[in-house]
Amino acid sequence: MKLTCVLIVAVLVLTACQFTAAISQTQRLSKKCIEDNHACGLLHHSPYCCNGTCFIVCIP
């Protein structure tokens, strides 16, 4: 009985992880990146910049 419960919980956790990973990948693929020298915000590693580096503008 305990083993069955553990297996059910493990399957549910793995399913949830796969589901969130799929949603994350879909969102990442659907966003268009900001071209170099266009405004992106403050200093941070931006997923919206095509090259990923942001310092007020996307740095080439």
UniProtKB/Swiss-Prot annotation:
Question: Which domain of life does the protein's organism represent?
Answer: Eukaryota
Tell me the first and last residues of the signal peptide: 1-22
Any one GO molecular-function label of the UniProt entry: toxin activity
Which cysteines form disulfides?
A: C33-C50, C40-C54, C49-C58
Alphabetic keyword roster: Disulfide bond, Knottin, Neurotoxin, Secreted, Signal, Toxin
User: Where can this protein be found?
Assistant: Secreted
Q: Name one GO cellular component term.
A: extracellular region
- The yes or no answer to whether the keyword RNA-binding is present is no
What does the record say about tissue specificity? Answer: Expressed by the venom duct.
Purpose = Probable neurotoxin.
Q: Which family does it belong to?
A: Belongs to the conotoxin O1 superfamily.
Notes on the domains = The cysteine framework is VI/VII (C-C-CC-C-C).
What's the protein name? Answer: Conotoxin Cal6.29
Q: Which organism is it from?
A: Californiconus californicus
